[in-house]
């Protein structure tokens, strides 16, 4: 697993610098408009995972690494676990980058009154919002990564993105629609969803809900890894 982790890092090492500059540019633009808003954080984790996963899959297809890699002292288990571990590290790094941008924007809002008068949210530091946004960033990254990696391992970069995007859209609809319905018509919401909403709106339990969200997404990521590993062992190269 360690060898595969290092191979993936070396493969996208130069691209990571470009992605870093791109994310900082996007984060800076978002901060200029939104100001001290922790809602900018979740985009960092998800965009980092999508960009790196696609770059690795494209590199595998162009260089035929999927076959050549098996002639090296690497097991199929190590290949799958190493890539999943590397993408998890990318998700964590992207989230930390988003946190850094949020903290910088918060300091700028507090230190530059002219800037604070222009942004949408000129408030101060929001610890609960920061924790929730960081958890949401990791959750989105793990869910998207858990969908993309099995499709890329099975179909490569040629057909993988089609299936991955279709699955991501389906999961998004299934996850977002209940939330929208509860927000629009809370009186008609099922008791289970109503209870979750009451927990999410309580500051005492919001941190626990955020932690549960990230843990659930990581569990899904682990299940995806196990399923991908089982399929990759049977794949005929």
What does each model-found stretch correspond to?
Residues 70-76:
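Short helix-to-coil transition segments within interhelical loops
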Residues 78-80:
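Alpha-helix N-cap/helix-start motif at helix boundaries, enriched for small hydrophobics
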């Amino acid at each position: 697993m360690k060898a595969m982790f290092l191979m993936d890092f070396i493969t996208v090492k130069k691209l990571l610098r470009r992605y870093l500059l791109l994310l900082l540019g996007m984060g800076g633009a978002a901060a200029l408009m939104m100001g001290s808003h922790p809602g900018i954080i979740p985009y960092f984790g998800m965009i980092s995972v999508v960009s790196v996963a696609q770059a690795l899959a494209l590199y595998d297809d162009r260089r035929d690494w999927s076959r050549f890699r098996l002639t090296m002292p690497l097991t199929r288990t190590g290949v799958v676990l190493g890539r999943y571990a590397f993408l998890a590290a990318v998700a964590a790094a992207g989230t930390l980058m988003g946190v850094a941008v949020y903290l910088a924007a918060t300091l700028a809002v507090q230190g530059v009154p002219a800037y604070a008068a222009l942004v949408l949210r000129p408030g101060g530091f929001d610890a609960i919002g920061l924790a929730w946004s960081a958890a949401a960033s990791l959750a989105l990254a793990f869910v998207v990564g858990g969908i993309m990696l099995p499709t890329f391992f099975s179909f490569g970069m040629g057909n993988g993105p089609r299936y991955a995007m279709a699955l991501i859209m389906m999961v998004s609809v299934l996850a977002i629609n209940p939330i929208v319905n509860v927000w629009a018509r809370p009186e008609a919401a099922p008791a289970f969803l109503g209870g979750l909403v009451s927990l999410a709106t309580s500051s005492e339990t919001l941190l626990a809900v955020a932690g549960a969200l990230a843990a659930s997404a990581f569990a899904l990521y682990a299940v995806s890894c196990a399923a991908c590993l089982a399929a990759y062992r049977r794949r005929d190269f």
